[in-house]
């Protein structure tokens, strides 16, 4: 199956999809595990939250989020990679409150309920701008009033002004959409879709950001 977006790096398949968690651990010298745990702690999850996980991957993030939930809390993952869905299902076998479905996040969809939080982690930057707008609208539609859209991804910066230790791997690894993503004012863009009350937490030399916003009125 061909990629929807040939210039994107977020449609992961084959070997990378099968061993994604291990690859991330090795590439980060074990640091990714600690980083993602800190980031999810910064979401300030309430124990009864219902969370929608856009681009849910292998379920690693879902398990970390679930540690903050009671039995009344829920997580639904949306993912399109069958290899990743299989890993997700294996990880959540003993958890009745976590589920996953095969669903694209870049196209309109409807769910049976509204959610307290929509979380997207290192997926958003890998889409064309017009498709990112679709994802924002999907998040808005899926949230209850005052629900939170939480984006964990690159912060805003000018690539050529970043330190070499960050700039070189960023230019080597990232797709063209990432270079456009980091130079956009996402608070302004999100506000145009009805999101308000922005909060952020920065990581890794301020190059990574957890951006939280609340659903207001469109």
Kindly give the residue locations of the regions a language model identified.
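Class I SAM-dependent methyltransferase SAM/SAH-binding core
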Residues: 52-54, 58-107
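C-terminal alpha-helical "lid/dimerization" subdomain adjacent to the S-adenosyl-L-methionine
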Residues: 4-7, 151-193, 198-202
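Conserved class I S-adenosyl-L-methionine
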Residues: 1-43, 60, 167
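Helix-to-beta-strand junctions that scaffold the AdoMet/dcAdoMet cofactor pocket
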Residues: 70, 128, 143-145
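A short acidic, Gly/Pro-enriched loop at the edge of an enzyme's catalytic core
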Residues: 109-118
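A short glycine-rich, Lys/Arg-flanked "PGG" loop and its adjoining helix->strand segment in the class I
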Residues: 133-145
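A short SAM/SAH-binding and catalytic strip from SAM-dependent methyltransferases
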Residues: 117-130
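Core SAM-dependent methyltransferase catalytic element
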Residues: 194-195, 201-218
């Amino acid at each position: 199956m061909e990629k929807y977006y040939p210039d994107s790096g977020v449609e992961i398949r084959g070997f990378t999809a099968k061993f994604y968690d291990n690859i991330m651990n090795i590439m980060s010298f074990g640091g990714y595990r600690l980083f993602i745990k800190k980031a999810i702690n910064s979401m300030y999850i309430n124990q009864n939250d219902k969370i929608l996980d856009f681009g849910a991957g292998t379920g690693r993030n879902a398990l970390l989020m679930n540690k903050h939930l009671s039995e009344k809390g829920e997580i639904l993952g949306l993912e399109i990679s069958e290899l990743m869905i299989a890993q997700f299902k294996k990880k959540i076998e003993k958890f009745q409150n976590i589920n996953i479905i095969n669903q694209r996040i870049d196209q309109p969809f409807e769910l049976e309920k509204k959610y307290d939080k929509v979380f997207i982690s290192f997926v958003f930057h890998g889409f064309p701008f017009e498709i990112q707008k679709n994802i924002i609208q999907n998040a808005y539609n899926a949230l209850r009033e005052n629900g939170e859209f939480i984006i964990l991804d690159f912060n805003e910066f000018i690539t050529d002004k970043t330190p070499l230790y960050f700039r070189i791997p960023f230019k080597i690894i990232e797709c063209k959409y990432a270079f456009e993503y980091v130079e956009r004012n996402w608070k302004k863009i999100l506000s145009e879709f009805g999101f308000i009350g922005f909060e952020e937490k920065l990581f890794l030399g301020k190059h990574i950001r957890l951006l939280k916003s609340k659903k207001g009125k469109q």
